[in-house]
């Protein structure tokens, strides 16, 4: 689906199975449920991916978003969790050394566990949703604004657009991602997971999610960073000595920079906290950790060319996740 740049949109961050909270947010945004589908007379919702995994009502959340998309009331782009689900269920190509595009190891199993459990008695539904995931574009460029789950990188988006003008990939491209270092693998990693940098001196960091990593997520918009601490962009802080470590010239040159003069860009993915606000006048992250009892956040986009802090709308996720 092409987005009409003259229309008004509500961009919505990572849902992760928080269906009741999503309904609460849609209600707050002025959408009404008509004929079983949430609708707005003049606006359209744009979801930034990661509808599935982790939360208590994954199937319900998918039905809400899918029904809106089918009715022309919403567009949903692909998040890394939808990509993971396709990879989990898709055989790897011969010669790749893998059984599935996404290997069935304990770490990957843990991430998709809630989704598979909640669909255990609804296999036809799961099959249909997996097919729908292929209709989710990896990116959307509406001219005056752009959406991608984690990171806008023209170095990947330009060749992708040449092959997939609507941003929607096919199974062949998904299977190509089974090969580490391939264009497909790197494109998914960059657009759906963002940029990262290896920790120095062989260090590892165990995050709040319990996973141990040898790298950290980085900003892709800093103009003149000096230290690791200037570029870290994740919930888990770097140890102070690491944060103070100067960036080498090679590391600085490797950083991606989304320019301040580029179109408005909306991303999810990054588990932010606090009061929703722009990162820069042309950049907003709308993932505020809803599934960790944070906020489910939207931005109400009209015709502005710079982001307005007053146009963030959100619902605090209550314990347990309820609608009122």
Regions from the PLM with identified roles:
Residues 18-19, 53-55, 82-86, 154-155, ...:
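Active-site environment of divalent metal-dependent phosphoester hydrolases
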Residues 55-62, 67-197:
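Active-site neighborhood of divalent metal-dependent phosphoester bond hydrolases
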Residues 8-16, 145-151, 284-286:
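Active-site-proximal beta-strand elements of phosphoester/diester hydrolases
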Residues 1-5, 37-38, 63-70, 137-141, ...:
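A short acidic-Thr-Gly-centered motif at the start of a beta-strand
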Residues 14, 50, 79-80, 133, ...:
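Divalent metal-coordination and catalytic microenvironments
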């Amino acid at each position: 689906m092409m987005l009409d740049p003259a229309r008004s949109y509500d961009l919505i961050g990572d849902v992760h199975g928080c269906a009741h909270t999503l309904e609460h947010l849609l209600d707050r945004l002025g959408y009404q449920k008509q004929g079983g589908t949430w609708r707005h007379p003049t606006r359209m919702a744009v979801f930034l991916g990661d509808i599935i995994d982790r939360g208590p009502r994954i199937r319900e959340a998918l039905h809400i978003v899918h029904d809106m998309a089918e009715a022309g009331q919403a567009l949903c782009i692909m998040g890394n969790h939808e990509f993971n689900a396709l990879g989990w269920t898709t055989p790897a190509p011969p010669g790749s050394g893998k059984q599935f595009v996404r290997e069935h190891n304990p770490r990957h199993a843990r991430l998709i566990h809630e989704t598979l459990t909640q669909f255990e008695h609804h296999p036809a539904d799961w099959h249909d949703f997996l097919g729908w995931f292929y209709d989710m574009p990896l990116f959307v460029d509406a001219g005056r604004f752009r959406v991608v789950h984690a990171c806008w990188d023209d170095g990947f988006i330009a060749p992708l657009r040449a092959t997939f003008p609507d941003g929607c990939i096919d199974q062949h491209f998904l299977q190509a991602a089974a090969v580490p270092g391939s264009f497909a693998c790197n494109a998914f990693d960059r657009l759906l997971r963002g940029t990262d940098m290896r920790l120095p001196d062989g260090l590892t960091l165990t995050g709040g999610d319990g996973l141990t990593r040898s790298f950290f997520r980085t900003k892709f918009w800093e103009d003149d960073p000096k230290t690791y601490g200037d570029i870290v962009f994740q919930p888990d802080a770097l140890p102070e000595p690491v944060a103070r470590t100067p960036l080498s010239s090679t590391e600085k040159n490797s950083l991606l920079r989304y320019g301040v003069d580029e179109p408005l860009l909306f991303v999810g993915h990054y588990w932010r906290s606090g009061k929703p606000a722009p990162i820069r006048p042309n950049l907003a992250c709308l993932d505020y950790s809803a599934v960790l009892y944070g906020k489910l956040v939207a931005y109400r986009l009209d015709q502005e060319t710079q982001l307005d802090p007053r146009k963030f709308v959100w619902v605090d996720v209550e314990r347990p996740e309820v609608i009122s």
